[in-house]
């Protein structure tokens, strides 16, 4: 390993060393008594690394192509690190007051983030699998963090069992690809794939690879775990599931299809378009009957991942750019929405029933309006930023020749808007009921308001995010 190669992986190495160091520190100094300092130290460490990575330049590889450090990886890592730090910060009060703030919690989040950083920089099937499993193993544990709850334990077990199945599918696909290509590096695989023609063995391998990765983004028909895990996990953990891991998996799909199978976009574009449509419609239709806001956010996530996959299905740099923009905006919307969900309490106990929001506009108009903005943005109502995110994805798909798919996407978006607008109806026109507690920690309130402001102001100026996404996409698709 040369000095140049080591410098490329330095952020991942530093974060891994930090995780192992604070794990030992926590064990030796009283475990949960140091949970809050570890949580805040972890958030600050990830923000510092995001700044360092964001200032990086160039497109390089390390370890014989196992690790790729390009603009696409840097953009994805910055968003992952910032979103993970935000979720940690806004979860401190919630976890502490419910006795869930154990010192392992922030460490598991950090280890999952290390795995995600490996995923977006993977240049080989082996590094892909290592990153994916590091993320998954940490998330299996954190889903069942509430050990005295049967629902939380069930969520963790269900996620583990189905996640193991998806890992098996991915490994089978990787073995097929290696068997027919004779190499595990993406740069080697793409030399085997002929322009416009994909050998049948590699096609089957690609299908199984995409099936394994589709599980991670909750794409239909690999979405079965999502509603139960979102509902059963502690709410801050659900917020984490809905943000950083989704971008990491989506970025990994983009890396695989463009770096390893970029010669045949027509083959995998059809697969991704089918997954996208199925996800959009199931998420939109199944969410209509939900009465629990965490389950509703699960189906919302499934539908939104369909739009992200539609951008990738285009098979162009514009498609990757639209996906990165969409996922970034989606993460901001979710951070703000979950900041509000964390504050939903009645008589000091958390509530997640949507009906609990009845006439919130009368008791807390500022929070109600901020949530209205975020819900309108999630629904894709102009002039909110969420509308422009969907517009960018649909425009990229039309530019790639998928005319009928964007039309179907618009219909799915209209159907899905119903359950967001139903929440707005409850807040402004619902029946009178026992009000929610007015308590909301200042940090959670700040995340809620800032996310709402971003959805309004971002339509005017995205503060350089659009240009950064364009440069990131150009570094991947060349």
Curated annotation (Swiss-Prot):
HAMAP family given in the database record: NDH1_NuoN_1
Transmembrane segments: 8-28, 38-58, 62-82, 106-126, 160-180, 200-220, 234-254, 268-288, 300-320, 322-342, 368-388, 398-418, 445-465
NCBIfam families the record matches: NDH_I_N, PRK05777.1-3
InterPro entries: NADH-Q_OxRdtase_suN/2 (IPR010096), ND/Mrp_TM (IPR001750)
The enzyme's E.C. designation: 7.1.1.-
Organism the protein comes from: Rhodobacter capsulatus
Consequence of gene loss (knockout): No functional NADH-quinone oxidoreductase complex. Cells lacking this gene have a nearly normal respiratory growth phenotype on lactate, however they are unable to perform anaerobic photosynthesis. It is suggested that in R.capsulatus this complex may function in reverse flow under physiological conditions.
Membrane topology, record value: Multi-pass membrane protein
Protein name (record): NADH-quinone oxidoreductase subunit N
Superkingdom of origin: Bacteria
Reactions that this protein is recorded to catalyse: a quinone + NADH + 5 H(+)(in) = a quinol + NAD(+) + 4 H(+)(out)
GO cellular component, one term: plasma membrane-derived chromatophore membrane
Annotated compartments: Cellular chromatophore membrane
Record's keyword terms, sorted: Membrane, NAD, Quinone, Translocase, Transmembrane, Transmembrane helix, Transport, Ubiquinone
Major site of localization recorded for this protein: membrane
Keyword Translocase among record annotations: yes
Subunit organization: NDH-1 is composed of 14 different subunits. Subunits NuoA, H, J, K, L, M, N constitute the membrane sector of the complex.
A Gene Ontology biological process term: ATP synthesis coupled electron transport
Recorded GO MF terms: NADH dehydrogenase (ubiquinone) activity; NADH:ubiquinone reductase (non-electrogenic) activity; quinone binding
Function: NDH-1 shuttles electrons from NADH, via FMN and iron-sulfur (Fe-S) centers, to quinones in the respiratory chain. The immediate electron acceptor for the enzyme in this species is believed to be ubiquinone. Couples the redox reaction to proton translocation (for every two electrons transferred, four hydrogen ions are translocated across the cytoplasmic membrane), and thus conserves the redox energy in a proton gradient.
């Amino acid at each position: 390993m040369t000095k140049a190669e080591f410098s490329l992986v330095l952020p991942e190495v530093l974060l891994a060393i930090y995780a192992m160091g604070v794990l030992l520190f926590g064990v030796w100094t009283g475990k949960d008594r140091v949970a809050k300092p570890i949580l805040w130290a972890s958030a600050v460490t990830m923000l510092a690394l995001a700044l360092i990575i964001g200032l990086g330049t160039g497109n390089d590889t390390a370890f014989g192509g196992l690790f790729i450090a390009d603009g696409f990886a840097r953009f994805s890592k910055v968003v992952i690190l910032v979103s993970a730090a935000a979720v940690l910060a806004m979860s401190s009060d919630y976890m502490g007051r419910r006795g869930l703030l154990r010192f392992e919690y922030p460490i598991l989040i950090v280890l999952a983030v290390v795995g995600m950083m490996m995923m977006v920089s993977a240049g080989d099937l082996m590094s892909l699998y290592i990153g994916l499993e590091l993320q998954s193993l940490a998330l299996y544990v954190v889903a069942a963090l509430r050990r005295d709850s049967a629902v939380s334990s069930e969520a963790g077990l269900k996620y583990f069992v189905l996640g193991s199945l998806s890992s098996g599918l991915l490994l089978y696909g990787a073995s097929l690809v290696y068997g027919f290509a004779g190499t595990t590096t993406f740069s080697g695989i793409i030399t085997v794939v002929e322009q416009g023609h994909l050998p049948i063995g590699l096609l089957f391998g690609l299908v199984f690879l995409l099936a394994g990765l589709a599980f991670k983004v909750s794409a239909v028909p690999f979405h079965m775990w999502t509603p139960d895990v979102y509902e059963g996990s502690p709410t801050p953990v659900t917020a984490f599931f809905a943000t950083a891991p989704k971008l990491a998996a989506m970025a990994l799909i983009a890396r695989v299809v463009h770096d390893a199978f970029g010669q045949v976009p027509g083959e995998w574009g059809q697969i991704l378009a089918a997954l996208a449509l199925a996800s959009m419609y199931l998420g939109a239709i199944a969410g209509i009957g939900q009465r629990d806001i965490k389950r509703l956010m699960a189906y919302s996530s499934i539908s939104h991942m369909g739009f992200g996959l539609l951008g990738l299905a285009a098979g162009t740099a514009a498609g990757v750019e639209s996906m990165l923009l969409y996922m970034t905006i989606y993460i901001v919307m979710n951070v703000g929405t979950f900041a509000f969900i964390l504050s939903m309490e009645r008589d000091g106990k958390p509530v997640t029933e949507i009906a609990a929001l009845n006439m919130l506009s009368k008791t807390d108009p500022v929070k109600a309006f901020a949530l209205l903005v975020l819900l309108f943005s999630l629904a894709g109502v102009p002039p909110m930023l969420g509308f422009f995110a969907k517009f960018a994805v649909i425009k990229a798909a039309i530019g790639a020749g998928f005319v009928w798919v964007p039309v179907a996407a618009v219909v799915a978006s209209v159907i899905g808007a119903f359950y967001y607008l139903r929440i707005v109806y409850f807040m402004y026109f619902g029946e009178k009921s026992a009000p929610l507690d007015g308590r909301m920690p200042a940090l959670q309130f700040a995340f809620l308001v800032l996310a709402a402001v971003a959805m309004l102001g971002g339509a005017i100026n995205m503060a350089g995010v659009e240009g950064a996404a364009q440069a990131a996409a150009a570094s991947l698709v060349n």
